[in-house]
Amino acid sequence: MNSFTLDEIYVGQKASVTKTITRGDLYAFAGLVDDYSPVHIDKAFGEQSPFGRCIAHGFLSGALFSTLAGNYLPGAGSLYVRQSLNFLRPVYAGDTITATFEVVKKGEEVTKPDGTVKFSPGRIVMKA
């Protein structure tokens, strides 16, 4: 776990975290947020959906930004106060995704990171 002070953070600084999404993650996240939509957890329903199989909840991928802020950049003691996401592609069980923050602006009290989630390696799944 990192713990950067505002003085230590610089524009262009990056942090990334990689996770392989499992079927277990889909069920665990559904239980955590009480969202049992069949497109996320029902195999037969997922196969009949436009996606062809179950997809991860968008915020399961988006939660990696909280992981980045709390553990890597800036790390311990940071407050994650705002998030705006664009979901560009579905994420399936078995996909490995990488979330990345890059500091694009630094103020006197806060920094503004840009974030992306990509398939590892590959196309962008989500932008923040």
Where are these regions (language model features)?
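Catalytic strand-loop segment that frames the active site of acyl-thioester-processing enzymes
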Residues: 1-54
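HotDog/MaoC-like acyl-thioester-processing domains
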Residues: 1-11, 91-128
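A generic structural signal for short beta-strands and their flanking turns/coil linkers
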Residues: 11-13, 17, 25, 35, ...
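Sparse recognition of residues in long alpha-helices and their boundaries
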Residues: 28, 45, 81, 110-111
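Glycine-centered flexibility motif
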Residues: 31-34, 67-70, 107, 115, ...
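A broadly tuned preference for mixed-charge, low-complexity surface segments
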Residues: 41, 66-72, 114, 126-128
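Hydrophobic beta-strand-centered segment that forms part of the acyl-chain substrate-binding groove
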Residues: 47-56, 60-105
